[in-house]
Amino acid sequence: MTQDKYAYIYNKVKDALETDKLFLRPELSLSLLSRVVGTNTVYLSKAINNGFGCSYSQLINCYRINYLIEEAQRTGENIALLAARCRFWSRSTFFDVFRQHTGMTPHRYMENVRRSSFPKHMHDHEGQRIIIEKG
């Protein structure tokens, strides 16, 4: 597959996630996203790996955590309710994913946000800033 095709798929994925907020749909899967984008799952997976620098599940979780944090800051809504709306059905999975992306528990993160002008960017489990988009 050509670089132009990968770039096209990358842009379609980005649009589906950012504009259509597909990551909030309960039935979202790699297969569904491939149909929305208009490609097969192999090309989609490769385009995600190359364009976003992560796997499909890491990408979806990153969008979900970013959305959850933005909504919690904007509305003050309970973070556990937001986690369910963001399709984190297991509390332990949510806590693990949240900690991987922020470096702390949801409660501690929100306390820091409320107390100060705590940076609102995300980190992966090694303390590196998460890059949603290369380039």
Predicted segments, located by residue:
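The alpha-helix within a helix-turn-helix
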Residues: S34, S45, A83-A84
